[in-house]
Structures are given as structure tokens and as C-alpha cells.
Amino acid sequence: QZKRPPGFSPFRK
């Protein structure tokens, strides 16, 4: 998994 910022939801709109 790539390191993402906290609270980041790419699949949530």
C-alpha cells in the first residue's frame, strides 16, 4: 500500500 495522509479515502465520495 502507498503511504497516504490520515483520513484519505480515494474510494469514498
Swiss-Prot record:
The modification Pyrrolidone carboxylic acid is found at residue 1. GO terms for molecular function: hormone activity; toxin activity. Expressed by the venom gland. It is found in: Secreted. The keyword Transport does not apply. Keywords: Bradykinin receptor impairing toxin, G-protein coupled receptor impairing toxin, Hypotensive agent, Pyrrolidone carboxylic acid, Secreted, Toxin, Vasoactive, Vasodilator. One of its GO terms (biological process) is regulation of blood pressure. Pfam families: Bradykinin. Its main location: secreted. One of its GO terms (cellular component) is extracellular region. Belongs to the bradykinin-related peptide family. Induces smooth muscle contraction. May target bradykinin receptors (BDKRB). May cause hypotension. This is Waspkinin.
